């Protein structure tokens, strides 16, 4: 098992490139099930979660591989001989594995998918996925920890999500593209990754309108064809790199991003005192030695993303003043707070709200990552802390960040990966 070792105090400078978006790559890889033939995807990040999705697809009979360990190209080949089952030993490690459910029942008429696992952040149920598939005519049973869905032919219908769900929107959208007739989806997630999936499906021959808004209309088609597509940049990784510049008092250009996808974060960084400029398809963050406290409320896109909450908390822990951070998306998403306390942060949790009183400095200490974004938060805090910080259980980090320690090192951080 690896750990990340950081010696803090170095201001970051230079240029770094964002990798492809994990949260776009996973549903797009699953969408390959909707067509016979080989789909080719570029700019696919080398992440543990991507490797898990490829393994899920191989388990079902697909030819799903990365071209090599050093390339960003993945290919998924599908023929008619698919075993439509995603087993527990894989799905338990990554809840996004449930994204194969919609494509399987739409294309092959049946699916058996284990109930999902992944990060230990609240309940994150899949009831809205199942509600949507039922509205399209699927017969669904929960048996021995598995979702079993069958349908001779899905039929278009109206799906009104009770709560906004990104993976639920994606799963039902993938099912509806092969349903007979028109499907209207309401209260949909508006994340860029949903819009990206719709773009890929339309390239395959689907007829989707409205993705990126709360109302999506889909005209079902008889079949789809394989596709070639480059995955959009990861706005959360890019945001984490901008916060790394901010917390270190540095000057960093994050290249190959989509600036408009990051408006909510950029607004908060500017409010805190950073200078953020757009340079082509990149964002530059130049930060003073100490920033001002800002309040943060996580909401669905286009609001402030929950996946950046832990990173901003690390930044606020060394800002001037008091910050109030309200988490409205997931319960139990303050698990990084006790570890930040170990570094000297002054944070009080009051239900879904954290009150962060900025301190002048942090001190290095051994800490433990509890989930994906918490691991990034602790690394960011370690960049600012005086002395040595050891972050253990970084397998969480590898689920969603492509060689983050190498990117930070190239910007001047004293950071390395070691065997724990």
Curated annotation (Swiss-Prot):
<feature type="active site" description="Proton donor">
    <location>
        <position position="119"/>
    </location>
</feature>
<dbReference type="GO" id="GO:0019277">
    <property type="term" value="P:UDP-N-acetylgalactosamine biosynthetic process"/>
</dbReference>
<dbReference type="InterPro" id="IPR036968">
    <property type="entry name" value="Enolpyruvate_Tfrase_sf"/>
</dbReference>
<keyword id="KW-0808">Transferase</keyword>
<comment type="function">
    <text>Cell wall formation. Adds enolpyruvyl to UDP-N-acetylglucosamine.</text>
</comment>
<dbReference type="InterPro" id="IPR001986">
    <property type="entry name" value="Enolpyruvate_Tfrase_dom"/>
</dbReference>
<dbReference type="InterPro" id="IPR013792">
    <property type="entry name" value="RNA3'P_cycl/enolpyr_Trfase_a/b"/>
</dbReference>
<protein>
    <recommendedName>
        <fullName>UDP-N-acetylglucosamine 1-carboxyvinyltransferase</fullName>
        <ecNumber>2.5.1.7</ecNumber>
    </recommendedName>
</protein>
<dbReference type="GO" id="GO:0005737">
    <property type="term" value="C:cytoplasm"/>
</dbReference>
<keyword id="KW-0133">Cell shape</keyword>
<keyword id="KW-0131">Cell cycle</keyword>
<keyword id="KW-0670">Pyruvate</keyword>
<feature type="binding site">
    <location>
        <position position="95"/>
    </location>
    <ligand>
        <name>UDP-N-acetyl-alpha-D-glucosamine</name>
    </ligand>
</feature>
<dbReference type="InterPro" id="IPR050068">
    <property type="entry name" value="MurA_subfamily"/>
</dbReference>
<dbReference type="Pfam" id="PF00275">
    <property type="entry name" value="EPSP_synthase"/>
</dbReference>
<keyword id="KW-0573">Peptidoglycan synthesis</keyword>
<feature type="binding site">
    <location>
        <begin position="124"/>
        <end position="128"/>
    </location>
    <ligand>
        <name>UDP-N-acetyl-alpha-D-glucosamine</name>
    </ligand>
</feature>
<dbReference type="InterPro" id="IPR005750">
    <property type="entry name" value="UDP_GlcNAc_COvinyl_MurA"/>
</dbReference>
<keyword id="KW-0963">Cytoplasm</keyword>
<comment type="similarity">
    <text>Belongs to the EPSP synthase family. MurA subfamily.</text>
</comment>
<comment type="pathway">
    <text>Cell wall biogenesis; peptidoglycan biosynthesis.</text>
</comment>
<dbReference type="GO" id="GO:0008360">
    <property type="term" value="P:regulation of cell shape"/>
</dbReference>
<feature type="binding site">
    <location>
        <position position="307"/>
    </location>
    <ligand>
        <name>UDP-N-acetyl-alpha-D-glucosamine</name>
    </ligand>
</feature>
<dbReference type="GO" id="GO:0009252">
    <property type="term" value="P:peptidoglycan biosynthetic process"/>
</dbReference>
<feature type="binding site">
    <location>
        <position position="329"/>
    </location>
    <ligand>
        <name>UDP-N-acetyl-alpha-D-glucosamine</name>
    </ligand>
</feature>
<feature type="binding site">
    <location>
        <begin position="22"/>
        <end position="23"/>
    </location>
    <ligand>
        <name>phosphoenolpyruvate</name>
    </ligand>
</feature>
<feature type="modified residue" description="2-(S-cysteinyl)pyruvic acid O-phosphothioketal">
    <location>
        <position position="119"/>
    </location>
</feature>
<dbReference type="GO" id="GO:0051301">
    <property type="term" value="P:cell division"/>
</dbReference>
<dbReference type="GO" id="GO:0071555">
    <property type="term" value="P:cell wall organization"/>
</dbReference>
<keyword id="KW-0961">Cell wall biogenesis/degradation</keyword>
<dbReference type="GO" id="GO:0008760">
    <property type="term" value="F:UDP-N-acetylglucosamine 1-carboxyvinyltransferase activity"/>
</dbReference>
<keyword id="KW-0132">Cell division</keyword>
